[in-house]
Curated annotation (Swiss-Prot):
Subcellular location field: Cytoplasm, Nucleoid
Domain SpoVT-AbrB span(s) in chain numbering: 7-54, 83-126
Family assignment from sequence similarity: Belongs to the MraZ family.
Any one Pfam family match given in the protein's UniProt record, by short name: MraZ
Xref: Gene3D superfamilies: Transcriptional regulator MraZ domain (3.40.1550.20)
CDD domains according to UniProt: MraZ_C, MraZ_N
One GO process term, biological-process aspect: negative regulation of DNA-templated transcription initiation
A single GO molecular function term of this UniProt record: transcription cis-regulatory region binding
Subunit structure: Forms oligomers.
Protein name: Transcriptional regulator MraZ
Amino acid sequence: MNRFLSNATNRIDAKGRVSVPAAFRSVLTERNIQELYCFQDFVFPAISVGGLDLLDRFERQIAADDPFSPAANQMSLLIHGGGVFVRLDAEGRLMVTDFIRDFTGITNEVTFVGRADHFQLWQPEAFQALQAQAREERKLAGRRSE
């Protein structure tokens, strides 16, 4: 398994750390990801987390564009200005910093959400609400196509 799949909610400890789900840690190990690149998602109130390959993908998009274009500058603001590197501790925990809390609204628990090549950190109720909304919209889209 080399994809981040499913979701899990874990409690933040008294020191502000949260355990990354074992299934996600095994993907990180399998993909030899030791330093995590985190950025504020472009659409959702979530922090997207992946390896350097995730950052590289965005930087290739910027390089393919005119570096002085508004689109390239906006992308750089989002992925560089809205990104940080973090590491897991020896027990597989992630420090839930103000960078994460302020953008997501996370307080006591974190929902980890698999997104195939990366995962996201969500405030649990926000994830549940947006997942239910997405499910309902897909259901309605299916009815319209009949």
